[in-house]
């Protein structure tokens, strides 16, 4: 058998003159979409050829084969079945690929020569709206970025949900934070150099011609799309970079979707000052919806998400990644949750929502005219629930709940229309028929009656023909090619009546047609075709009617989403014993008996609650204690409590009083960032630098073991300097965990003639024989032991190694390598020298070396100096 190396032969040809008509048709379609995978419809398969086939075979793990040859070379080919293509399409989109779907136009059986084909649809990671291609509980976003001397403009759209937003940021750090928050599936950038490092290698980045990101052309694009004379109503007149990005995004959507987008009706502007800022590192460290190792289990979202509907789940995720600083909004949410709990209404709402479905995305498909029959039935059932939801909300006095009650609107007429028009359980596809309910349209009912009665007519005809012909084995049947027929076996064919006309000859039988059967066939087949045609017409009419109601229906879906989130908050508060936080205008952070929501959820034994008390005169806690003692857990739990309070949730504490917070910034144990060529220590210093430059007196900062990535005294010096800067320059709320006991002396120092604003707390452990028991309780004052060797033994180090470590520890302590005074001479940190692991006494060689100036030496002088130094050793 001849084999072909598809990796070295048969690249996509430059000339198509010598190719077969089919391959010429393929190349014509491919030339319009050179960067996309082309799904080329051939019967029951979508085929891919040449480089597309190689790529798809690798990504989808499907067979790479060949389809004969064309132009004198074999044609690499791979294919996926039409009936299962959506699964393959979803996998490609998840990998950041875009696909052009080239369909057969018309009926191939009726085509004379080559069947016509045309690209009817383009699917990209950021523009998908099909239910099968979407994660139901996560937004699928398309983002565009423009840049200028002033910074970056961002625009992003959720085409499946009908949202379109813009923003502007000043710095690369802020840009990275926004991308980390929004996690776009597809990112459009100008095809230029010098983009930030974090964009390189990112899945779904599309480079577009730079001229598409021009502010003036973007403005014209937006005005034309929204049919407006100015953009003042959107509040983006003073945002040229955002306008440029929005125009580029809109142009890409129109280019790929090939249709109007009536569900995008406005642009919203996000205001950075309205939300608590969190950079990419903070989101990663706090494990909001993804753990540091990439797992999505045992995260804050996993514990918090008690929503019933997919659209509620997506809204909760958005809230979680953008905690608000708007006190009035948050107080209204807290009050709404409390009102639901007090009235016992959360359970009733959640029960009603179980039949609700994803109305938000269904309405998008209605707007795009791609809604399927079961979208209609889901929308019908959801609207039918509104009276029950209104009844539940009516007696509640929460201002926010009453606002949402009003936003539900009145949709009785639409509900009644769908109840009367749509079958109780419609089929998956319109082409299957039976979507429109009986009794809705008299003409359709009559056509269906003709089709329905056909079966009985055929039974009666078969019995009559058997009786009249005397052929007991005579059968009446139907196939799609030849239509209706009367079948008689070969042995009985001579008995066929004279008025039978032969229609088809088989090996063992003859098939006939009669005038009566032909008349019936014409009538029935016509009725079925007309029935499907009539259903399609009525279906399009429903889409037209619903299209006029879209704005009100979208508001209704938004209100239902928020009610789902608030009811979920109420359920979590009761199930997990959480309390309503208090938002204070004074600077403070007081948490009584706080717990870590995720750790508490996964533990099979009670969680040890702890307090936190920070205010104007006490802004930093230096936290000491053994490894595994709970320092990181304590810091994270307080950050998560603050975050939960600022999305409107209750919090895992008996009481929480929280003053104004503008940022949450963290530096908690990152691993090596090898992909970007950065060591653990480099990452640590970069994140620390960001915090020192951005923290304000209203920021909450978590610092975990600063300085551990370098030598002992280097690390100690850095940790001391960072702590002082945070306490005295930034003056932010800081939780500073450290293994340097010397830092506990900072609390006793004065600053600007007053107290330091620093306090010591520790997490303790006790030894019971050879066992070490962690207490996990936060106590005032510094720790007096680290228990490092005991933790090493717990980790399974060989006993011989632990014993050797104990001996070495005694030696080091006797040599003064480690101070037990818990104090550090400040001058030691100010001295301009580099300390090693142990401090050696000065020597003549060292003094001679320090006297040298390498920049002033010639090569010969340097060599002579080296010999002199060697002689001193």
UniProtKB/Swiss-Prot annotation:
Positions annotated to bind ATP: 625-632
Source organism superkingdom: Bacteria
CDD domains for the chain: ABC_MutS1
One Pfam family named in its UniProt record: MutS_IV
Keyword annotations of the record: ATP-binding, DNA damage, DNA repair, DNA-binding, Nucleotide-binding
An example Gene Ontology biological process: mismatch repair
One GO cellular component term noted in the UniProt record for this chain: cytosol
UniProt entry tagged with the keyword Nuclease: no
MF terms in GO: ATP binding; ATP-dependent DNA damage sensor activity; damaged DNA binding; mismatched DNA binding
Cited function: This protein is involved in the repair of mismatches in DNA. It is possible that it carries out the mismatch recognition step. This protein has a weak ATPase activity.
UniProt record similarity statement: Belongs to the DNA mismatch repair MutS family.
Entries under NCBIfam families matching the protein: mutS1 (TIGR01070), PRK05399.1 (NF003810)
Protein name: DNA mismatch repair protein MutS
Organism of provenance: Xanthomonas oryzae pv. oryzae (strain KACC10331 / KXO85)
Gene that encodes the chain: mutS
């Amino acid at each position: 058998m001849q084999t072909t190396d598809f990796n070295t032969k048969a690249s996509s040809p430059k000339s198509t003159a010598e190719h077969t008509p089919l391959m010429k048709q393929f190349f014509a379609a491919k030339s319009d979409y050179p960067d996309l995978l082309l799904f080329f419809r051939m019967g029951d398969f979508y085929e891919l050829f040449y480089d597309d086939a190689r790529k798809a075979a690798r990504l989808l793990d499907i067979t790479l084969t060949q389809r004969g040859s064309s132009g004198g070379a074999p044609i690499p080919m791979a294919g996926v079945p039409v009936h299962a293509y959506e699964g393959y399409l979803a996998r490609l989109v998840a990998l950041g690929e875009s696909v052009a779907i080239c369909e057969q136009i018309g009926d191939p059986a009726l085509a004379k020569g080559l069947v016509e084909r045309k690209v009817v649809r383009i699917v990209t990671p950021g523009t998908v709206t099909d239910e099968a291609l979407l994660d139901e509980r996560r937004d699928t976003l398309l983002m565009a970025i423009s840049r200028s001397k002033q910074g970056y403009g961002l625009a992003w759209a959720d085409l499946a949900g009908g949202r379109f937003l813009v923003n502007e940021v000043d710095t690369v750090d802020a840009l990275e934070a926004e991308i980390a928050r929004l996690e776009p599936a597809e990112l459009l950038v100008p095809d230029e150099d010098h983009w930030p490092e974090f964009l390189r290698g990112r899945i779904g980045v599309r480079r577009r011609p730079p001229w598409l990101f021009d502010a003036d052309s973007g403005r014209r694009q937006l005005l034309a799309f929204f049919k407006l004379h100015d953009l003042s109503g959107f509040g983006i007149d003073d945002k040229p970079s955002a306008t440029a990005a929005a125009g580029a995004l809109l142009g890409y959507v129109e280019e790929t979707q090939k249709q109007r987008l009536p569900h995008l009706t406005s642009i919203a502007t996000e205001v950075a000052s309205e939300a608590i800022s969190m950079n990419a590192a903070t989101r990663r460290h706090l494990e909001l919806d993804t753990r540091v190792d990439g797992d999505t289990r045992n995260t804050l979202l996993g514990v918090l998400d008690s929503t019933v509907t997919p659209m509620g789940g997506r809204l909760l995720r958005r809230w979680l990644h953008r905690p608000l600083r708007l006190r009035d909004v948050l107080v209204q949410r807290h009050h709404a949750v409390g009102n639901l709990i007090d009235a016992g209404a959360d359970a009733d709402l959640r029960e009603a929502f179980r039949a609700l479905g994803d109305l938000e995305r269904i309405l998008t498909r209605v707007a795009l005219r791609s809604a399927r029959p079961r979208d209609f039935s889901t929308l019908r059932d959801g609207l039918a629930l509104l009276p029950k939801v209104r009844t539940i909300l009516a007696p509640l006095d929460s201002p926010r709940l009453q606002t949402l009650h009003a936003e539900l609107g009145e949709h009785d007429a639409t509900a009644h229309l769908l109840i009367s028009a749509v079958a109780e359980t419609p089929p998956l596809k319109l082409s299957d028929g039976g979507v429109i309910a009986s009794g809705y349209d008299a003409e359709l009912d009559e056509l269906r009656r003709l089709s329905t009665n056909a079966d009985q007519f055929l039974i009666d005809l078969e019995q009559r023909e058997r009786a009249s012909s005397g052929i007991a084995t005579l059968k009446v049947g139907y196939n799609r090619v030849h239509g209706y027929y009367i079948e008689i076996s070969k042995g009985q064919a001579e008995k066929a009546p004279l008025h039978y006309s032969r229609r088809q000859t088989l090996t063992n039988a003859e098939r006939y047609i009669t005038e009566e059967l032909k008349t019936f066939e014409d009538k029935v087949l016509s009725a079925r075709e007309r029935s499907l045609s009539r259903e399609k017409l009525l279906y399009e009419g429903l889409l037209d009617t619903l299209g006029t109601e879209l704005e009100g229906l979208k508001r209704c879906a938004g209100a239902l989403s928020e009610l789902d989130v608030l009811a979920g908050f109420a359920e979590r508060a009761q199930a997990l014993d959480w309390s309503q936080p208090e938002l204070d205008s004074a600077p403070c952070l007081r948490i009584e008996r706080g717990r870590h929501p995720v750790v508490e959820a996964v533990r099979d034994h009670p969680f040890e609650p702890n307090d936190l008390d920070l205010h104007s005169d006490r802004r930093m806690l230096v936290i000491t204690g053994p490894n595994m003692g709970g320092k990181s857990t304590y810091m994270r739990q307080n950050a998560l409590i603050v975050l939960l309070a600022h999305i409107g949730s209750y919090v895992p504490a008996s009481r929480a009083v929280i003053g104004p917070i503008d940022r949450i910034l963290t530096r908690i144990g990152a691993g090596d960032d090898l992909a970007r060529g950065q060591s653990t220590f480099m990452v640590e210093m970069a994140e620390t630098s960001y915090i020192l430059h951005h923290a304000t007196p209203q920021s909450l900062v978590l610092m975990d073991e600063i300085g551990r990535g370098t030598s002992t005294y280097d690390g100690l010096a850095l940790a001391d300097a960072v702590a002082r800067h945070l306490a005295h320059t930034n003056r932010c709320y800081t939780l500073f965990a450290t293994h340097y006991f010397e830092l506990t002396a900072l609390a006793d120092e004065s600053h600007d003639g007053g107290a330091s604003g620093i306090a010591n707390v520790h997490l303790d452990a006790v030894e019971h024989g050879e066992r070490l028991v962690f207490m996990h309780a936060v106590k005032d004052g510094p720790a007096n032991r680290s228990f490092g060797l005991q933790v090493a033994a717990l980790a399974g180090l060989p006993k011989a190694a632990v014993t050797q470590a104990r001996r070495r520890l005694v030696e080091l302590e006797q040599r003064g390598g480690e101070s037990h005074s818990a104090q550090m001479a400040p001058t030691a940190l100010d001295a301009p020298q580099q300390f090693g692991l142990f401090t050696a006494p000065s020597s003549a060689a060292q003094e001679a070396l320090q006297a040298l100036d390498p920049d002033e030496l010639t090569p010969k002088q340097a060599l002579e100096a080296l010999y002199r130094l060697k002689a001193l050793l």
